[in-house]
Swiss-Prot record:
Belongs to the universal ribosomal protein uL22 family. This is Large ribosomal subunit protein uL22. InterPro entries: Ribosomal_uL22 (IPR001063), Ribosomal_uL22_bac/chlpt-type (IPR005727), Ribosomal_uL22_bac/org-type (IPR047867), Ribosomal_uL22_CS (IPR018260), Ribosomal_uL22_sf (IPR036394). CDD domains: Ribosomal_L22. GO terms for cellular component: cytosolic large ribosomal subunit. This protein binds specifically to 23S rRNA; its binding is stimulated by other ribosomal proteins, e.g. L4, L17, and L20. It is important during the early stages of 50S assembly. It makes multiple contacts with different domains of the 23S rRNA in the assembled 50S subunit and ribosome. SUPFAM superfamilies: Ribosomal protein L22. The keyword Membrane does not apply. Part of the 50S ribosomal subunit. It holds the Pfam family Ribosomal_L22. GO terms for biological process: translation.
Amino acid sequence: METIAKHRYARTSAQKARLVADLVRGKKVAQALEILTFTNKKAAALVKKVLESAIANAEHNDGADIDDLKVAKIFVDEGPSMKRVMPRAKGRADRILKRTSHITVVVSDR
């Protein structure tokens, strides 16, 4: 049984979150949580929270056994970018893009 959890509009770029997602793809959930706990990146905390949510969804909604679960799919899509202005010298301004991403984790017992 596949169970999904999503974090939409996560405040990190998709490029940075994908680095972390690649670490846990295909792993058992216990091993994935351990890897994410000791990964020193902001995106690791975001991905870990989504993974924990997916595990809780599988246990509560589908009655799955946690020991059998593995990360079947994990992917990070780009979300909308927030446009901000940074003032520069001589009355100029630069545009800053604050990027967001959508993190999706699918856990499965197969």
